[in-house]
């Protein structure tokens, strides 16, 4: 299982990220303070129908909850749009999304955005392909037991981690 522990410390301290030491300079701290998720939605990628959306993101909250219609589990592909703002330049924005079921890592995906202009607001769309129907767990079993952990990076430097517990309706 992949776990991330982030301690936001002064620029003179060092921290470990996935086993590699890194210098936590002032720019990294400024990136963390200036990065914000504005809104997100998820659509059925084949029809474009919005299945879920939220404009309320508290990036400082340890874990959020989302109520998502169970019909989303029937979509072959889900398109996720994420709108974010950054005060600082980010040279290589990427995210790692981990799907955690009852404390165990089920899946992990990596997405790469690239360069982010300072003082900009951007919309990033990703398409996520569903597992085969016979491999899917039922909504009743998943609901409340799945946490989506998304960690944003500039290259190897962590910017922010957001955890969302999923409840299927």
Where would I find each of the regions flagged by the language model?
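N-terminal onset of structured domains
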Residues: 2-117, 133-135, 139-169
């Amino acid at each position: 299982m992949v776990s991330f522990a982030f301690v936001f410390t002064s620029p003179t301290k060092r921290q470990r990220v996935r086993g590699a030491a890194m210098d936590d300079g002032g720019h990294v701290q400024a990136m963390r303070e200036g990065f914000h998720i504005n809104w997100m939605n998820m659509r059925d990628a084949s029809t474009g129908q919005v299945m879920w959306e939220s404009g309320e993101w508290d990036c400082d909250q340890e874990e959020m909850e989302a109520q998502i219609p169970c019909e989303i589990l029937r979509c072959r592909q889900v398109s996720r749009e994420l709108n974010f703002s950054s005060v600082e330049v980010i040279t290589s924005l990427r995210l790692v999304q981990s799907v955690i079921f009852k404390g165990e890592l089920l899946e992990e995906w990596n997405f790469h955005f690239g360069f982010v202009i300072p003082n900009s607001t951007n919309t990033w769309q990703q398409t996520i392909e569903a597992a085969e129907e016979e491999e899917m767990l039922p909504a009743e079993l998943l609901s409340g037991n799945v946490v989506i952990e998304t960690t944003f990076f500039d290259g190897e430097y962590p910017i922010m981690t957001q955890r969302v517990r999923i409840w299927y309706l």
